[in-house]
C-alpha cells in the first residue's frame, strides 16, 4: 500500500504534469480504501440477486409456464415494490453518511427510525398493485395461465415486502458507517474512523480494519444465510413436496425473513448500534419533508433506469421469441456486470458523505475523483473482456444457435454501453453523497425517456434494426448522461455541499439552539432553555412555545447528542399530518382491494 502511495507522490512530482492534475494526491490509498469498502458490498449485491435466480432455476425444471410465471412475478415484484423501497431508502445514503461523518452520530439512529416508518407506509400502495397483478398482466395481453400463476406468487410474497424494505434499510445503516470506530483520538474532527480520510494518515491500524470488517461483512454473512435457507427451502417445497410456484414463493419469503432476522440479531448482539442509537425517539416523526425531498429524487433516479430495462424487455417481446431470448441473456450479463460499479458507487457515496459531514471538502473531492477513475479502468477491462467472449457468453444461457448468434452481434455494443453506464453509476454515488439526487433524477428521466428509449424504438421498429436498435438508443442515453454528470460535478460547489451536510446531520440546528440558549436577556422570550435538576446534562429547547420532551431511557449524553428538528411540529400537527399520510396510504390499499373484488366479479 505504501508503494501505491509513493507512486502517486512521484506522479505529483512533475514527471507528468497532465497526469498529476488528473490523479488526486493520495489516489492509491483512497482507491484501496474504496475497493476494501465496495468489495463486500459487491458480494452482498450478488447474494441478494442470487435468491431470485435460485427460485427461477427450481421452477424452470417444472415447465415453460412455471418458468415464465416466476420470471414475470420477480419482475413485477421488483418494478412495483422492491425498486420503490430501494429508491426511497437511498435518501439514507445521504443522511446517514453525512450524520455519521459529523459529531452528531446519534442522529443516524433517528434517520433509521424515520426511514422504517416511511417505508412501511409505502408498502400499502405497493400492496394495492400486488393485489391486482393478474388483471394488470391480462391488460397487457399476457398469457392467462402465466398471469394466474404469477398472481399466486405475488400474493404469497405480500408479507415479504416490508421485510425486504427493513433488510435493505439495515444494510444501509451499516454501509453508511463506513470505515468505522475506535479512533476518536486520531481524528481531527473528533469523528471515529475519519483519520483515514487524510493523506497524513497513510496506513490503517489492524484494529480499525478489523472493526471496519465488523460493519461490512455482516451483510455478506446474512446474504449467505439467506441463500442457504432459500436453496434448502426450494428443494423441500418445490422438489419434495411438489408445491410448484407457490412453494418457490414460500421459499423466497422464508429466506427473506431468515436473512433479515440474522442481520438484526447480529447488529444487536455484536453491539454495532451503540455509537449511533440513542433509543426510540419521537423525533423520527419530525422532518419528513426534508427526508422526502431526498427520497423521491433518489427513487426516481433508480427506478427510471430500472424500469427502462423492463420496458426494453417488453418491447423485444413484441418482435419475436429470438429477440426476447437474446434480450434476456444480455439482461443477465448486464445485471452481473452492474454489481461491480454498484458496489463501488455505494462506497463512493459513503466516503463522500462522511467527508462532507466532517466538513472536509478536499477529501470529498478526492473520494469522488478516485471512484470515477477507478471505475473507468475497471469498466474498460470488463467491456473488453465481454467483447472478446461475445461468442462464448451466449452458450452459458442457451443452446439455441439463433439466439447465440444474435447475442454475439449485440454484445460489442453492450460492452461500450457498460463503460458509460458504470461511470454513470459511480457518479450516482457522488450525487447521493452530496445530496444532489434531484439532478440525477432529472438527467436519467430526460436521457432515458426523452432520448434513449424513443431513439431505440425508432431504430428498432422503423429502421428495423431490431434488438440492435434498442441498445444503440440506450448507448446514446448513457453517453449523454455521463457528459451531464461530468459537467455538473466539475462545477459543483463543495463548500455549499458541506454546509448542506451540516443541515442534514442536524448539527446546524443544534449549534443554533446551544448558542442562543446561552445568551442572556430577551432572547429567551423566543427560545427558552430548561435544565432539569436531576439531570443537568439534559437541555430541553423549545421554539416560541413551552413544549418539551424528556426520554428517561436515554443518558444525558445521548439526549444531548440528538439534534433539534429543522422545524418542530406540535403534537397536534404531528397527529394531523402523519395521520393524513397513513390515511392516504391506507386509502390506496382500499382502492386496490376494491378494484380486485370488482374485477373478479366481472
From Swiss-Prot:
Compositionally skewed regions (Polar residues) per UniProt: 507-518
Topology, Cytoplasmic side: 1-33, 88-119, 175-219, 270-289, 349-368, 424-442, 488-578
Extracellular membrane side: 55-66, 141-153, 241-248, 310-327, 390-402, 464-466, 600-602
Keywords: Antiport, Cell membrane, Membrane, Transmembrane, Transmembrane helix, Transport
Xref: InterPro entries: MATE_euk (IPR045069), MATE_fam (IPR002528)
Region (Disordered) location: 503-529
Subcellular location: Cell membrane; Apical cell membrane
Sequence intervals crossing the membrane: 34-54, 67-87, 120-140, 154-174, 220-240, 249-269, 290-309, 328-348, 369-389, 403-423, 443-463, 467-487, 579-599
An MF annotation (GO) of this entry: polyspecific organic cation:proton antiporter activity
Pfam families xref list: MatE
Broad class of where this protein is predominantly found: membrane
UniProt topology in membrane: Multi-pass membrane protein
Any one Gene Ontology cellular component term annotated for this protein: plasma membrane
Catalytic reaction(s) noted: thiamine(out) + H(+)(in) = thiamine(in) + H(+)(out); estrone 3-sulfate(in) + H(+)(out) = estrone 3-sulfate(out) + H(+)(in); creatinine(in) + H(+)(out) = creatinine(out) + H(+)(in)
Biological processes annotated in GO: organic cation transport; transmembrane transport; xenobiotic detoxification by transmembrane export across the plasma membrane
CDD domains: MATE_eukaryotic (cd13132)
Outcome, altering residue 247 to V: Found in a patient with renal disease; uncertain significance; abolishes plasma membrane localization
pH dependence statement: Optimum pH is 9.0. Active from pH 6 to 9.
PANTHER family the UniProt entry points to: MULTIDRUG RESISTANCE PROTEIN (PTHR11206)
Family: Belongs to the multi antimicrobial extrusion (MATE) (TC 2.A.66.1) family.
Function: Multidrug efflux pump that functions as a H(+)/organic cation antiporter. Mediates the efflux of cationic compounds, such as the model cations, tetraethylammonium (TEA) and 1-methyl-4-phenylpyridinium (MPP+), the platinum-based drug oxaliplatin or weak bases that are positively charged at physiological pH, cimetidine, the platinum-based drugs cisplatin and oxaliplatin or the antidiabetic drug metformin. Mediates the efflux of endogenous compounds such as, creatinine, thiamine and estrone-3-sulfate.
Protein name: Multidrug and toxin extrusion protein 2
Source organism of the structure: Homo sapiens
Gene, per the UniProt record: SLC47A2
Amino acid at each position: 500500500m505504501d508503494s501505491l502511495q509513493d507512486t502517486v507522490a512521484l506522479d505529483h512530482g512533475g514527471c507528468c504534469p497532465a497526469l498529476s492534475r488528473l490523479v488526486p494526491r493520495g489516489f492509491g490509498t483512497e482507491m484501496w480504501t474504496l475497493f476494501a469498502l465496495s468489495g463486500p458490498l459487491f458480494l452482498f449485491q450478488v447474494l441478494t440477486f442470487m435468491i431470485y435466480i435460485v427460485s427461477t432455476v427450481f421452477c424452470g425444471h417444472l415447465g415453460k409456464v412455471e418458468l415464465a410465471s416466476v420470471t414475470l412475478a420477480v419482475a413485477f415484484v421488483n418494478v412495483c415494490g422492491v425498486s420503490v423501497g430501494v429508491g426511497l431508502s437511498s435518501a439514507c445514503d445521504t443522511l446517514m453518511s453525512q450524520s455519521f461523518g459529523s459529531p452528531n452520530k446519534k442522529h443516524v439512529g433517528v434517520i433509521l427510525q424515520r426511514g422504517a416508518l416511511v417505508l412501511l407506509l409505502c408498502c400499502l400502495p405497493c400492496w394495492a398493485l400486488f393485489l391486482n397483478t393478474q388483471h394488470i398482466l391480462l391488460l397487457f395481453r399476457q398469457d392467462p395461465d402465466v398471469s394466474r400463476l404469477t398472481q399466486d406468487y405475488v400474493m404469497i410474497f405480500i408479507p415479504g415486502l416490508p421485510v425486504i424494505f427493513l433488510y435493505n434499510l439495515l444494510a444501509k445503516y451499516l454501509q453508511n458507517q463506513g470505515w468505522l470506530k475506535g479512533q476518536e483520538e486520531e481524528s481531527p474532527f473528533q469523528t471515529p474512523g475519519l483519520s483515514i480520510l487524510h493523506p497524513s494518515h497513510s496506513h490503517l491500524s489492524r484494529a480499525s480494519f478489523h472493526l471496519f470488517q465488523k460493519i461490512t461483512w455482516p451483510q455478506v454473512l446474512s446474504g449467505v444465510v439467506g441463500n442457504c435457507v432459500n436453496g434448502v427451502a426450494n428443494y423441500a417445497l418445490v422438489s419434495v413436496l411438489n408445491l410448484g410456484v407457490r412453494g418457490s414463493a414460500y421459499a423466497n419469503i422464508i429466506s427473506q425473513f431468515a436473512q433479515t432476522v440474522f442481520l438484526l440479531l447480529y447488529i444487536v448482539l455484536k453491539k454495532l448500534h451503540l455509537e449511533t442509537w440513542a433509543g426510540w425517539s419521537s423525533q423520527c416523526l419530525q422532518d419528513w419533508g426534508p427526508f422526502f425531498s431526498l427520497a423521491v429524487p433518489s427513487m426516481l433516479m433508480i427506478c427510471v433506469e430500472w424500469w427502462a430495462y423492463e420496458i426494453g424487455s417488453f418491447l423485444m417481446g413484441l418482435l419475436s421469441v429470438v429477440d426476447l431470448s437474446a434480450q434476456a441473456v444480455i439482461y443477465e450479463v448486464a445485471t452481473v456486470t452492474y454489481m461491480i460499479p454498484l458496489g463501488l458507487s455505494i462506497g463512493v457515496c459513503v466516503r463522500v458523505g462522511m467527508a462532507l459531514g466532517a466538513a472536509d471538502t478536499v477529501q470529498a473531492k478526492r473520494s469522488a475523483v478516485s471512484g470515477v477513475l477507478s471505475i473507468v479502468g475497471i469498466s474498460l477491462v470488463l467491456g473488453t473482456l465481454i467483447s472478446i467472449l461475445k461468442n462464448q457468453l451466449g452458450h452459458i444461457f442457451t443452446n439455441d444457435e439463433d439466439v447465440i448468434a444474435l447475442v454475439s452481434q449485440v454484445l460489442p455494443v453492450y460492452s461500450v454501453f457498460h463503460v458509460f453506464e458504470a461511470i454513470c453509476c459511480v457518479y450516482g454515488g457522488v450525487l447521493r453523497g452530496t445530496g444532489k439526487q434531484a439532478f440525477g433524477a432529472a438527467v436519467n428521466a430526460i436521457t432515458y425517456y426523452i432520448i434513449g428509449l424513443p431513439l431505440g424504438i425508432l431504430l428498432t421498429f422503423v429502421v428495423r434494426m431490431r434488438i440492435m436498435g434498442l441498445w444503440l438508443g440506450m448507448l446514446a442515453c448513457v453517453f449523454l448522461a455521463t457528459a451531464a454528470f461530468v459537467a455538473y460535478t466539475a462545477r459543483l460547489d463543495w463548500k455549499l455541499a458541506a454546509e448542506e451536510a451540516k443541515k442534514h446531520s442536524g448539527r446546524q440546528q443544534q449549534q443554533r439552539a446551544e448558542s442562543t440558549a446561552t445568551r442572556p436577556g430577551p432572547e429567551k422570550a423566543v427560545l427558552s432553555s430548561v435544565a432539569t435538576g436531576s439531570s443537568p446534562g439534559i437541555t430541553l429547547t423549545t421554539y416560541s412555545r413551552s413544549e418539551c420532551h424528556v426520554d428517561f431511557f436515554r443518558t444525558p449524553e445521548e439526549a444531548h447528542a440528538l439534534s433539534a428538528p429543522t422545524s418542530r411540529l406540535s403534537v397536534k400537527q404531528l397527529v394531523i399530518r402523519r395521520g393524513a399520510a397513513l390515511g392516504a396510504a391506507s386509502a390506496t390499499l382500499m382502492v386496490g382491494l376494491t378494484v380486485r373484488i370488482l374485477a373478479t366479479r366481472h
